[in-house]
Amino acid sequence: TLEQLGQVNLLLGCNNCGKSSVLDALFLISGAANPLLNIRINSLRNYDRIEPDDLLLNYYNLDSSVPINIAADMKDGLSSRELSIRPLLAQKEVVNMTDMVKTSPSNQETSTNYGFVFDYRLTTNGEKKAYESSLIVTPEGREKREAQVYPASGYKEQIVAQYVSPNYDLRESVKILDEILKNKEEHHIVEILQQVEPRIKDIMLGEKAVMVDVGLSQRVPINIMGDGIRKILAVIVTLFKSKDGIVLIDEIDNGIHYKSIPILWSAVLSMAKKNNVQVFVSTHNADS
């Protein structure tokens, strides 16, 4: 149980002690009616297989007989949410006759759908509502690496949550930065980046790339500026986008020089306050 949470919360601990699991749980409960999130948290770690055994990875000790249960009380003291994730395994009723004649007969033949179900319960001002959504992989979908998603009927998520993983994709930052540039708000980003690299004069989007002016004859891709600059950009544009929402940052100091850590934290604290964002950060480095 996590209690007395604040606007900015730091999870500190050694490797493999469960810090990322806490962030995963927060991500799931923030989008409790979205079954895709159970797949997304694995893809954040560059693991995107959807075989039956892979769906067990989020269960404690790989034991799916015990559902994943997550609950959260909201700040207003009047609402709460509960999420239970249980596996789904069902025999398929439709048999492909063409496939059947091509294979050797066996009395153990099966055609199975698998996936999981999200049971979501929301309490607001004493009024309780229940929703159900699911993700199902059919035999055909398994071959194509596709899943069928059945969203919760009549429910629209009100919480905006973003997850910045250690393996963050800079392309996501490009999408967010595009919105910032359209609103002429990029000076907030540039001011923070200049504290790490004073040569940066401005920032813009090129052909699917973030370009910066560092005083050379032409702008250069931010990709060549090092991991630290890219990580800081990913964090601050995500905070900028997530007004009145939640941002989860796993291994915040990964790839960042220790001298730049205070700059990053200053940006996190100021932008969290300015945009009313609740932030959860993990690190294994006590210096952070």
Residue locations for each model-derived region?
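Phosphate-coordinating catalytic segments in nucleotide- and nucleic-acid-processing enzymes
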Residues: 32-240, 246
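Switch/communication elements of ASCE P-loop NTPase nucleotide-binding domains
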Residues: 1-37, 211, 219-288
